């Protein structure tokens, strides 16, 4: 569970950005659970924004995210289209 302070913006990182950053920014599993009791009556605003690169965009690990302590987990680049298909197959949507 995650508890945010007032006036906080929460950004959920997706799988593609995780790959691009070599897990420097890990992907999150997004789940919303209503708080119990009176806290459920407080306002909560959510604005989803999804960004997907052009199908031919080559996903290569960002050089600044590779180090001796964090070697490149993805030495072979992949297009965003192929990556999306790979992920959809993994979760059995294709």
Where are the predicted features?
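C-terminal flanking tails of non-heme Fe-dependent oxygenases
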Residues: 1-94
